[in-house]
Amino acid sequence: MRKIIAFAIALTLGFQGIVCAQDNKEEEKNGLQFTEQKRLPVTSVKSQDRAGTCWSWSSISFLESEIIRLGKDSVSLAPLYIVWNTYNEKAKKYVRMHGNLNFGQGGAFADVLWAIENYGIVPLSEYSGLNYGEEIHAHGELDAILKAYLDAVVKNPNKKLSTAWLRGYDAVLDAYLGAKPEKFNYKGKEYTPVSFYKEATGLNAADYISLTSFTHHPFYTSFPLEIPDNWIGEKSYNIPIDELMGIMDKAIDNGYTFAWGTDVSEDGFSRKGLAVVPDFDNYEMADAEIAKWVSMPKIMKMAEWLKNPGKEKQIDQQMRQEAFDNYQTTDDHGMHAIGKAVDQNGNKYFIVKNSWGEYGDYKGYLYASYSFVEYKTLNIVIHKDAIPKDIKKKLNIQ
């Protein structure tokens, strides 16, 4: 979940400049009209700004909704507390692997659950992660320094690693993100990060599992999803796409949101707040317009499709697999699915909370069609109780 930082930067800068072709769509007109069927409780929309940390913001948003679902007081949690701990653990593994590990701002949902289980969590009010003279998150300099530091350690110029390298590395994290709080007061009670996690949130990290759907591994088994940002090697349960779609659909009906890993590099992903998979080959038009349509650039086809919405592609398991195998689907972005809606033609959508601030037509939310979700979902993280008993039995989930 790394490439999306370029688009997030554009959003932070008010869309100055053209990035990833999305800004060419400035005059897109949206002909879709939505009726929301269900919207589950969430905290406010936040922004990752100019940092590639969507994995932390989206996971934290998901867990904030879980806290509400579990009957605890709503609280905004600190994504950068997770980032500090993840950077620390990733550094240790990077050095252990002699530099043969993906290192950068990106991460995965599993990182957040691992960090909370091991280091707890704190409210956003206790840890902003802004300790470097900026009002917004911008991690380019930090990431470059950390990578250069670790590469110098891995070169091992003294022929033996010192006992100081990790202390020095953590000092850089403290300088940029701030020292982690050891104790803090929240609503009149003193907590440590671990006691806050265990006493105030109602969360149990072990209750959350990752689901995916690809054919290069057997269904109803688990495997580490082969994406660069899965540095921690977390396993996902593999099920057919129709079952995964059914779980997501029923989860919302039953009051469960989920963290959603996807790829937003498709032409059908619009910064206006839409994610669709247009079937340009079968777009209905007058015969006289066909020749013009065939030669039209995709960006213009997309604009026309949005003005006069047509059909979407029919997605199947093979299409998903081919897109993953040929790098058309990559670990691009993490978001938080929080509801369901239909358009004026009866087509279904998930309501998705993003972490780019209150941008676009829907103020930080977007509508992702079921076709898009079916095609571009890498994995989801969800509470195990949202999974039907028959599927849990197949997966041997207790």
Please place each PLM-identified region on the residue numbering.
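Bacterial Sec-dependent N-terminal signal peptides
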Residues: M1-K25
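Short, positively charged
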Residues: N24-G31, E312-I315
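Active-site signature of cysteine proteases
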Residues: R167-Q398
